[in-house]
Amino acid sequence: MFLASIANWWRTAPNLVIESGGELAGCGGWSRRRTLFGGDNFAGRDSGLLDPATDAAKIRAFFVAPAFARRGVARLLLEECEARARAAGFARLDLMATLPGVPFYAASGFVGDAAVALDLGGIPVRFIPMSKTL
């Protein structure tokens, strides 16, 4: 089951990696899966695919190595994800931003909703749901 889930994930959630001088500078991706973040092989997760005509694609798993922060890595990744989601027929994007990521996404045209707190292993973590029309 786990291997089948991973195989499905790679087909439906393309991730991008940027390297510089052999070092990982950043990574991120977009998805056509209903699950906004985390794996969909857990109870209560919807593993279905999104419909580009009615649903928003999901921006997922954006990380930039501290040594490469504020050097355009995240912007390059996001622009590529937007282009690929648009090419797949999606007109909107959704994401769940960490609080430090909100200014970046807002500057990139995303609009935030009210903060939500999610329990991550017994620790409540605040996120801001954000969306953007392509």
Could you say what each language-model-derived stretch is?
Residues L78, A85-T98:
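Conserved GNAT acetyl-CoA-binding A-motif
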Residues A106-A115:
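Conserved acetyl-CoA-binding loop of GNAT-fold acetyltransferases
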Residues A67-F68, G72-E80:
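Conserved acetyl-CoA pyrophosphate-binding loop and the N-cap/start of the following alpha-helix
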Residues M1-I6:
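Conserved GNAT-fold acetyl-CoA-binding loop/helix
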Residues A69, L93-P103, D119-G121:
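Conserved beta-strand-loop-alpha-helix junction that forms the acyl-donor binding cleft
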